[in-house]
């Protein structure tokens, strides 16, 4: 079995380089501790206490990145965060930090770029709507 302090030190180093959610760290700790759930839980709590792991900070960074760089909408972001095990209140708070005006501009530019390819298609409007929904934008926006 791996030594507790070595695993803790390695995970602290990893967390200092990038953001991780609690579920990811728990999986890493379980693997490193060879399935010892109690020790992995203690490691996770210590990392939370020392602010190496913070689900709100992770969710906010994830939402900003996916919104700005990949053009995802709030629905797709919230589903992705829920799949990571982030609770609903944290997801709502993280999505609330996204600037609505910037998100609208990104949505508009993504849809306009797609429209250039669909303009001559008889089902172009339907396909554009479907594309926007698949990107995580709401129907009424």
Functional labels for PLM-detected ranges:
Residues 1-141:
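An alpha-helical, amphipathic repeat domain used for nucleic-acid recognition
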């Amino acid at each position: 079995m791996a030594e507790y302090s070595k695993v803790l030190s390695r995970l602290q180093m990893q967390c200092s380089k990038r953001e991780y959610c609690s579920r990811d760290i728990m999986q890493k700790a379980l693997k490193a501790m060879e399935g010892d759930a109690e020790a992995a839980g203690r490691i996770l709590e210590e990392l939370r206490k020392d602010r190496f792991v913070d689900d709100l900070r992770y969710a906010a960074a994830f939402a900003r990145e996916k919104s700005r760089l990949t053009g995802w909408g709030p629905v797709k972001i919230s589903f992705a965060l829920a799949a990571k095990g982030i609770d609903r209140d944290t997801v709502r708070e993280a999505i609330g930090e996204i600037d609505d005006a910037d998100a609208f501009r990104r949505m508009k530019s993504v849809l306009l770029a797609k429209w250039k390819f669909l303009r001559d298609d008889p089902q172009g409007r339907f396909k554009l709507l479907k594309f926007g929904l698949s990107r995580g934008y709401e129907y009424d926006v």
